């Protein structure tokens, strides 16, 4: 049984690529045709890649690998958090801070600081500080929650990075490759398939396409960890 059907992908708009002038020739193997100046992705090949990606991700989860979902653009942000939380993965959905992977010692210290501030807030310790100091601490807390809130459960570097929009997340790609962390990547027609281990050619701009693909990958992680193979992911946000 296919992990994702052609009709599901068509309905989600997963076949729409970028304008032909914005393409990466390395994606030609995944392109079906050009229509009205826009490349159309071959969804038969996407389905094949998605089946492979599902099995690869499921096996990685079954062997205890830890996952990091990355997608910071507006239309992906909410989906990234939703699906990462559903499968117990960490996530970055606001902004990739330089060194999130390659300077992990410093990043881990910032995450620990976030946890300390959250404990202080919940215990009332911040409220007991002078007004100005409390304001500064709360501002720091809000900023850390915004950018690092999805990493609180990440005690060490991830084993796999799941990526939305390779072009936008260039720094994440470079850091992962520098550390030999494999990438499971949604690839639009302007991307480079050579920069990831597990390619999924599809529209990485449409919300419903992102929902569908990340939802299935979250299903794969849950199946690998818990043995459940019910496809619940990729549902539309309310």
UniProtKB/Swiss-Prot annotation:
Membrane-spanning segments: none
Gene Ontology molecular function, alphabetical: structural constituent of ribosome
InterPro entries in the cross-refs: Ribosomal_uS2 (IPR001865), Ribosomal_uS2_bac/mit/plastid (IPR005706), Ribosomal_uS2_CS (IPR018130), Ribosomal_uS2_flav_dom_sf (IPR023591)
Keywords of this entry: Ribonucleoprotein, Ribosomal protein
One Pfam family hit: Ribosomal_S2
Keyword Transmembrane: no
Swiss-Prot/TrEMBL GO biological process terms: translation
Protein's UniProt keywords contain Hydrolase: no
An example Gene Ontology CC term for this record: cytosolic small ribosomal subunit
Protein family according to the UniProt entry: Belongs to the universal ribosomal protein uS2 family.
Listed name of the protein: Small ribosomal subunit protein uS2
Organism whose genome encodes this protein: Prochlorococcus marinus (strain MIT 9211)
Gene this chain is encoded by: rpsB
